[in-house]
Amino acid sequence: MIKKITALTLLVSTALSAETLPDSHMMRDMSMGESRRALQDSTREVNQLIEQRRYQQLKQQRLLAEPEPAARALPQSAQCLPIAGVYLQGVTLLSPADLSALSALPEQCISSNDINRLTRELTRLYVQKGYITARVQIVRPNSQGELGLSVTEGFIEKIEGGDRWVNSRLLFPGLEGKPLKLTELDQGLDQANRLQSNTTKLDILPGRQVGGSVIRLRNQHAKPWLITAGTDNYGQKSTGQWLARATATLDSPFGLSDFVSLNANSTLENPAHRYNRAYTLLYSLPYGAFTFSGFASFSSYENHQQLPHNVVKLHGQTQQYGLRSDYVFYRDRDQIDSLSGQLTYKRIDNYFESVRLEVSSPTLTLAELSASHLQILPNGVFSANLSVEQGLPWLGADRHPSSVHLDSQFTKGKLFANLSQRLKLADATYQLNNLFYGQYSRDPLPGVEWLSLTDRSAVRGFSRSTQTGDNGWYLQNTLSRSVNIGTATLTPRLGADVGRILPRQDSSGWRSSAGLSSGATLRYRQALVDLEVSRGWILSNHATPEDPVQVLARFSYIF
C-alpha cells in the first residue's frame, strides 16, 4: 500500500509541478546514455582483448620459412625418353581439379625437360597448399612403359618442446600423425603468441620415419602478468570526467595457454555525490583453430541533479555476461577468414530516486553471428567484420513489445571495416588509418543498442551534445607519424571524422555530425602520455548549442 501511495504521489507531483522535477525525457536520456556507454565500453574492451596480438604470424609475414623443396630431377635434356607416359602415386592431398592445372605432357616425345617441369609444378602445388615437406621422387617405368612420380606427402611424427606456457595439446590438437600443413602450424603459433609473455617459434626437423617430421617448439618466455594503471578525463560531466583505470592480465593461469584479464575504472571527483564505476572480466582458452571466451561486466553510476527547490538522485547499474567462440576456417600467407558466435545477456536497471525507470531498464538476451576477414596488403592491413544480432526470449529477457519496452527480439546488422596503410610523403613515412562502422535494423531498438554518434569512439570532438539513433554510420580518418626521440617515441596525429544517424523515435530524418582533432602520443619505456584537442559540429540542427573545444589527456604506466 505504501509503495502504491508513493508511486501515485510521484505521478501527481510530476503532473502538477513540472518545475520541481526533471523532464521525463531528460531522465530517460541521461540514464540510457550512462547504461549505453557502460555496455558499449565493456564490449569494446572485450573485443580489443580478444583481437589483441592475434594473427601475429600473418602480420609479421610468418616466422616459418616456406622453402620450395628440391625435387629429384633428371639431367636436363631435350631428347626423347623411352617411355610411353607418366603415372602418379601417393597423391592424396590434391584434388583432380588441382592436378588438372599441371601442364600436359607431349603425346609422342617426352623428354627429361618435360619430366622436370612436371615435377616442379607438382611440388609447387603442394607448397602453395601449405604441404611444404612433400617430396616427389622418380621411379622406374612400369610394365606399360610409364615412368612413375611417387609423392611422399609428409606428416607430423611428433611435436615436442611444449610446457605450461605453450601447451602443444591445445595449440596443435590432433596434428601428430597427420599431414604437415604450414597454415595449421601458423595457426598454433598465433595462438601461442597471443599471450604477451610468449615469443614462440618452431623448427621442422627430420623424423625417424619416412616422410615424418618433428616439430620442435622454442619459446622465449617473459613475466606472465602485466598491470597497467592510468588516469584520463574521458568521463562524463554528470558523473565525473577524471577516471582512474587499472588492468591486470595473467597468461596461462591453468597451464592451458589460456588468458585472463580484469579491468576496472572509477571516477575520481566527489565520489560521495557522483560516480561511475565499471569492471570487466575476460577468460579465453585456445583449441587449435578455435578460441573460446567468456566475459562478464558490471557497472554502476550515480549523479545528483540540482533543481530549483531540491536535489534528486539518478542512479543505476548494468550487468553483461557472454560466451563466445571464434573459428579460423581459412588462412594462407596473405589472409585469414574466421567465423564467430556469441551469446550475451544484458540487464539494465535505472532509477529516479527509488523508482525504477522501466522505459530505460530493459533485459536482453542476444545471439550474434559474424564473419571476419583480414588481408595483408603491400603497404598495410585491411580487416572487416560483418555480423548479425538477434534478440532472444531467453534467460528472463523481455518477451513482448509494449508501450514501455521496444521489441527486445530485434534483428540488427553491423559492419566494421578498417584500413591501415603506410604512406610516403616528402620522404617521410606516415600511417593512415580509416575506420568505418555502420549498423542497421528494421526494428525499433532498445536505447542501449543505439549508435551514439557523439561518443569519442565515433565522431571525435563532442563533450556536451548527444546524437543517438537506431541506424547510422561513422567514418574515422587518422593520419599519424612516429618519430624517435632518443629512447622515446613521439607520434603526432591529425583526425577528421564524419557520421550520420537515423533515429526512429522521431521524424526529424537523418542527422549528421563532423569532428576535427589533433593530438600526440609520447611513449617512453613503460610510460605513455597522450594529449588531444578536438571539436565537433552538429551539421543537421543549427539550433543545437555549439560544443566547445575539447581537451583530453591520458596517462598510463605498465608495471
Please report, for each region that a protein language model flagged, where it lies by residue:
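A generic beta-sheet turn/junction motif
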Residues: N142, R208, L285-A289, Q375-L377, ...
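Gram-negative/organellar outer-membrane beta-barrel architecture
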Residues: V166, D186-P378, D547-I558
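Transmembrane beta-strands of outer-membrane beta-barrel proteins
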Residues: I227-A229, D258-L262, F292-G294, L323, ...
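C-terminal beta-signal and terminal closure region of outer-membrane beta-barrel proteins
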Residues: S507-F559
